[in-house]
Swiss-Prot record:
It comes from Dictyostelium discoideum. The keyword Lipid metabolism does not apply. Pfam families: EF-hand_1 (PF00036). InterPro entries: EF-hand-dom_pair, EF_Hand_1_Ca_BS, EF_hand_dom, Recoverin. The gene is cbpK. PROSITE patterns: EF_HAND_1 (PS00018), EF_HAND_2 (PS50222). This is Calcium-binding protein K. Belongs to the recoverin family. The keyword Repeat applies. Keywords: Calcium, Metal-binding, Repeat. One of its GO terms (biological process) is regulation of signal transduction. Residues 60-95, 96-131 form the EF-hand domain.
Length: 192
């Protein structure tokens, strides 16, 4: 559980950047130690991370979970430390909607081109449909919510695909899309 401590400065930095209280931070550190202890290695392995988040994102496929792990492993060392873990929980649960949508775009921009190409949009639509079904929306409604934000009218250069800015602008204007992916202030599922 090596990387399970934060310096006083790191705690203060996290408190400034998030809505977490000092008590929240302490509880998150305790929970991190428990969740990251299963393989006796330092930090949160990819397997532990996926196990932890798969419960909360049961409709997500393995490749998307691996991509999420990679995005949160900010130092690229293959292990999520406590600071990266707290950041992940904040982004998924308490961050402003625009930040969450930016993360969602990055999650599906698998080639890091800055654009969502057709295959990436298809994966995004599939996740939205699965999330929508899990929340009781009809398949048609969930498809409509996803397709409405990724339609050609929102894309300046159709050859390149949908840019990050275009995605965030379009998605943030669709209350239904935001609800389906659980990125509204009162989350539909507890991440933490």
């Amino acid at each position: 559980m090596g990387n399970s401590k934060l310096s006083k400065e790191e705690k203060e930095e996290i408190i400034k950047k998030t809505k977490y209280t000092p008590e929240d931070i302490e509880q998150l550190i305790k929970d991190f130690k428990v969740a990251a202890a299963s393989d006796k290695k330092s930090g949160f392995s990819q397997e532990e991370f996926i196990k932890f988040f798969k419960v909360r994102f049961s409709n997500w496929d393995e490749a998307s979970m691996v991509r999420m792990f990679t995005l949160f492993d900010s130092d690229g060392n293959g292990v999520i430390d406590v600071k990266e873990f707290i950041t992940a929980l904040y982004l998924m649960a308490k961050a402003p909607t625009l930040d969450k949508l930016g993360f969602f775009f990055d999650l599906f921009d698998s080639d890091k081109s800055g654009y969502l190409e057709r295959e990436e949009v298809d994966k995004l639509v599939n996740i939205v449909v699965c999330c929508g079904k899990g929340l009781g929306y009809s398949i048609n409604d969930a498809i409509d919510y996803a397709v409405s934000i990724t339609s050609c009218r929102h894309i300046a250069d159709y050859q390149k695909g949908m840019s990050r800015e275009e995605f965030i602008k379009s998605a943030s204007q669709s209350e239904n899309f935001v609800k389906v992916i659980c990125f509204y202030e009162s989350p539909c599922m507890q991440l933490y």
